[in-house]
Amino acid sequence: LLVYDNLLLNDKNEMNKDSSYDKKTNALDNYKNDSTIDMEKK
């Protein structure tokens, strides 16, 4: 997840002025939440 977090930070920096920034952030947050749940199940 460290690599993913770094990619997420880079995306946020690039998307700050983009109108779809919030939508993409929500999708990434949902992805991270799903990954965390999957890890807890295992």
Swiss-Prot record:
Residues 15-26 have a biased composition (Basic and acidic residues). Residues 15-42 are annotated as: Disordered. It comes from the Eukaryota. One of its GO terms (molecular function) is L-lactate dehydrogenase activity. Keywords: NAD, Oxidoreductase. It catalyses: (S)-lactate + NAD(+) = pyruvate + NADH + H(+). Transmembrane segments: none annotated. It is an enzyme of class 1 (oxidoreductase). Pathway: Fermentation; pyruvate fermentation to lactate; (S)-lactate from pyruvate: step 1/1. Its EC number is 1.1.1.27. Belongs to the LDH/MDH superfamily. LDH family. Homotetramer. This is L-lactate dehydrogenase. It comes from Plasmodium falciparum.
